[in-house]
């Protein structure tokens, strides 16, 4: 079902008055969640955030009833089609989403297979066919593979009819057995290259070229030095033309995390790595038969924020391919810490030429007596160099294919697949490090700005279903926007780009996001401050638009966002001045909520006021007679400043503080006297009732001859005196006092809820969020 939500209309603003009478002796504590107002926030913090209520108008959703796990996405630009692999189903949707009914293939698991799956100890929800691979074979057919209730199957689909999966065959070694197993696959030259596990238990990892019969595949050796409990992330192909080497071979790169065999501590250390094989590899004639002779791997280093320590888990890797002739691709990876409780995400960029340089460097040899790796000396490396693709220079040496390589070369590469040096990120450090967001997926594309300069824009999917849009400026990523994607938090499982649209797959749906939605930026300053390479302010249209390379009458500033020099001075919007009545000495927090987390804010207050404490949520003021007056929060970004919030601090009912204090004291004395009088009358009535009951008992004793002067045996005497008040009751004279069925003197409509602690009174119906009586 396709659905497009309408843009929500803003409701009426609340009146700028307090809808309740000022309290007599309560401290008014203002507290809201807002952007920081003191200090400079890092660019890893999103500049703006759109909750689901605002973001929903920019999203288009697709979901089929009773269908889940929309995790496999494939975009076919030629046919403008998005293929979606879900649980037991495959869909074909026209791009961009337009409401057209999608085509669907149901690829169900027979009940006999499901019974066998359950007999193997698997849960009912696991015994389905989770689609894991979708790949374009040619213009007429797709290849697809699914888990098929822990018995992987593969088949082809005729895209013109799109009715069923045909020519089924075993998918073992191509597709994982369950969706929780990380895998990767890529099609190169009509051939499928995969990285997955080969057995039911998931203990035999394999990187293979799946052509023909399984026994004829070229695959990795079953040695822990080759692959040691890997979690595969991505697979990518680079052609020789992208290297500028027309005589070379296609190279397939696999990105994964595996357990290190080098024991630097008592814990199992996870290491992110990249491996490479050559498309023309035929294996060895005797040694490494049906095995890769070009398999090399190296560490990927993405230093963490603490002591330069590398992040140990690779979560995702995206490839950004420039236009033909505009340079080599670049890889963007998301890294996280392997240690529980360390919520660290880092984004690093890697250049293919840096990876190739490491693969051409020294090998590492693992010394079994010390469990540490040492570099192999150059004079110990045989010739021709092990692990190289067969190129023209090797053919000149009579090595026409890998089948003609000598055994000493094959033996060396079998025993030394790991390189000694790591691959460092471009610029030597991460582009982005955050300690409060868990990134799971990434895609990237290159956008040309109004000036003609190109910028890389990254889309980062989070663990709780948010989308962060970031632009790379120099050696830093600046997170421009946080977009909530789903009504309920859920991980982002897959992402694909199609022109100006981003397709996001999750457990419950596929979401289409417009990546060039400039129209929501309503003013010149908002358009410039957004720093979006796609958007520019048009003076002719008086709107923020996607510039599409047009320069006339448009302005944009990606790196400086200098509003003051590009935009005309906009009429200032003065916020409503909220009057804040206070009645006793205490602390008041005045909120300041700028629209941008990157804005720097200052407070203007009455002269002579010094008892002020800037906070992340506003300004804390110590209430004194000298603190009364006007307060304003002014925020600046891009050279433009405006007042965000304004307050007037006054004594409760516009009377002087001394008269107010006298009134409070007088009211307190009157209340105390009335309380004493009421207590005396109550005790008198209780005494009279007890006396009358005693007289009736004495008369009854005279009649039956019983002595009620002492308690009967087996009972305990007790006193009828009222219990003394508890210390908690004595702390809360205001909370216990009621007037007009209200609480603490406030009428019932402004009571929010019962307080978890009787020392806190919560109010509603006004910008005063919290009253804390314990601060009085």
From Swiss-Prot:
Topological domains annotated Cytoplasmic: 687-776
Segments crossing the lipid bilayer: 666-686
Predominant place of localization: membrane
Location relative to the cell: Cell membrane; Postsynaptic density; Perikaryon; Cell projection, Dendrite
Keywords: Cell membrane, Cell projection, Developmental protein, Differentiation, Disulfide bond, Glycoprotein, Immunoglobulin domain, Membrane, Neurogenesis, Phosphoprotein, Signal, Synapse, Transmembrane, Transmembrane helix
Glycan attachment residues as annotated in the record: 69, 138, 514
Modified residues (Phosphoserine): 724, 726
Pfam families: PSI, Sema, Sema4F_C
Extracellular-facing ranges: 40-665
GO terms of biological process kind: axon guidance; negative chemotaxis; negative regulation of axon extension; neural crest cell migration; positive regulation of cell migration; retinal ganglion cell axon guidance; semaphorin-plexin signaling pathway
Motif (PDZ-binding): 774-776
GO annotations of cellular component type: dendrite; endoplasmic reticulum; glutamatergic synapse; membrane; perikaryon; plasma membrane; postsynaptic density membrane; postsynaptic membrane
Disulfide-bonded cysteines: 117-127, 145-154, 278-389, 302-348, 518-535, 527-544, 592-633
Quaternary assembly: Interacts (via PDZ-binding motif) with DLG4/SAP90 (via PDZ domain 2); this interaction may promote translocation of DLG4/SAP90 to the membrane.
Protein name listed in UniProt: Semaphorin-4F
Organism of this sequence: Rattus norvegicus (Rat)
């Amino acid at each position: 079902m396709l659905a497009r939500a309408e843009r929500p209309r803003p409701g009426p603003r609340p009146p700028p008055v307090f809808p309740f009478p000022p309290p007599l002796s309560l401290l008014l504590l203002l507290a809201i969640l807002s952007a920081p107002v003191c200090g400079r926030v890092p660019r890893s913090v999103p500049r703006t955030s759109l909750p689901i209520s605002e973001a929903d108008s920019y999203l288009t959703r697709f979901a089929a009833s009773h269908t889940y796990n929309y995790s496999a996405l494939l975009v076919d630009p030629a046919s403008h089609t998005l293929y979606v692999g879900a649980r037991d189903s495959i869909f074909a949707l026209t791009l961009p989403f337009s409401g057209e009914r999608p085509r669907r293939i149901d690829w169900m698991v027979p009940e006999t297979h499901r019974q066998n799956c359950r007999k193997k100890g698997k849960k009912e929800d696991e015994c389905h066919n989770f689609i894991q691979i979708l790949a374009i074979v040619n213009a007429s057919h797709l290849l697809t593979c699914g888990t098929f209730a822990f018995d992987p199957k593969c088949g082809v689909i005729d895209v013109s009819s799109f009715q069923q999966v045909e020519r089924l065959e075993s998918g073992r070694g191509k597709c994982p057995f369950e969706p929780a197993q990380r895998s990767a696959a890529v099609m190169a030259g009509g051939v499928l290259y995969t990285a997955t596990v080969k057995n039911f238990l998931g203990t035999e990892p394999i990187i293979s070229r799946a052509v023909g019969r399984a026994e004829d595949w070229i695959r990795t050796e079953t040695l822990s030095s080759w692959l040691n409990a890997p979690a595969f992330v991505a697979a990518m192909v680079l052609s020789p033309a992208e290297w500028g080497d027309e005589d070379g071979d296609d190279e397939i790169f696999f990105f994964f995390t595996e357990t290190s065999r080098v024991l630097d501590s008592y814990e199992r250390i996870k290491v992110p790595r990249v491996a490479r094989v050559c498309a023309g590899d035929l294996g060895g004639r005797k040694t490494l038969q049906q095995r890769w002779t070009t398999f090399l791997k190296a560490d990927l280093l993405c230093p963490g924020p603490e002591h330069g320590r590398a992040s140990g888990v690779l979560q995702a890797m995206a490839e950004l391919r420039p236009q033909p002739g505009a340079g080599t691709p670049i890889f963007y990876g998301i890294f996280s810490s392997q240690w529980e409780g360390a919520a660290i995400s880092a984004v690093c960029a890697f250049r293919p030429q840096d990876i190739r340089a490491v693969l051409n460097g020294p090998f590492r040899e693992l010394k079994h007596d010390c469990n540490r790796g040492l570099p192999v000396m150059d004079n110990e490396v045989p010739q021709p160099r092990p692990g190289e693709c067969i190129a023209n220079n090797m053919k000149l040496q009579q090595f026409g294919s890998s089948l003609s390589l000598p055994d000493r070369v094959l033996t060396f590469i079998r025993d030394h697949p790991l390189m000694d040096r790591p691959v460092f990120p471009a610029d030597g450090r991460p582009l982005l490090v955050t300690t409060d967001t868990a990134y799971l997926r990434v895609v990237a594309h290159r956008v040309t700005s109004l000036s003609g300069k190109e910028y890389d824009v990254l889309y980062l999917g989070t663990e709780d279903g948010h989308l962060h849009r970031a632009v790379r400026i120099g050696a830093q990523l600046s997170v421009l926007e946080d977009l909530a994607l789903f009504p309920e938090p859920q991980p982002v499982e897959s992402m694909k780009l199609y022109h100006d649209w981003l397709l996001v797959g999750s457990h419950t749906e596929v979401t289409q996001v417009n990546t060039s939605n400039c129209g929501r930026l309503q003013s010149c300053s908002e358009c410039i401050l957004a720093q979006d390479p796609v958007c520019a302010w048009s003076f002719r249209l008086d709107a923020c638009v996607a510039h599409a390379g047009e320069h006339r009458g448009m302005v944009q500033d990606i790196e400086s966002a200098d509003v003051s020099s590009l935009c005309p001075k906009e009429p200032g919007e003065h916020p409503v001045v909220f009057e804040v009545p206070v009645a006793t000495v205490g602390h008041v927090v005045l909120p300041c909520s700028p629209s941008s987390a990157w804005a720097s804010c200052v407070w203007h207050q009455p002269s002579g006021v010094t008892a002020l404490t800037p906070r992340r949520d506003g300004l804390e003021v110590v209430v004194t007679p000298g603190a009364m007056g006007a307060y304003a929060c002014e925020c600046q970004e891009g050279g433009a400043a405006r007042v965000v919030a304004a307050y007037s601090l006054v004594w409760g009912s516009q009377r002087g503080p001394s008269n107010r204090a006298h009134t409070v004291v007088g009211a307190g004395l009157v209340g105390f006297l009335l309380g004493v009088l009421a207590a005396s009358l109550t005790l008198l009535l209780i005494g009279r009732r007890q006396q009358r009951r005693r007289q009736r008992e004495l008369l009854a004793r005279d009649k039956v001859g019983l002595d009620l002067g002492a308690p009967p045996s087996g009972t305990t005497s007790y006193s009828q005196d009222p219990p003394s008040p508890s210390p908690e009751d004595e702390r809360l004279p205001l909370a216990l006092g009621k007037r007009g069925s209200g609480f603490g003197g406030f009428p019932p409509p402004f009571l929010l809820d019962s307080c978890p602690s009787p020392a806190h009174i919560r109010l509603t119906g006004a910008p005063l969020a919290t009253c804390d009586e314990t601060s009085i």
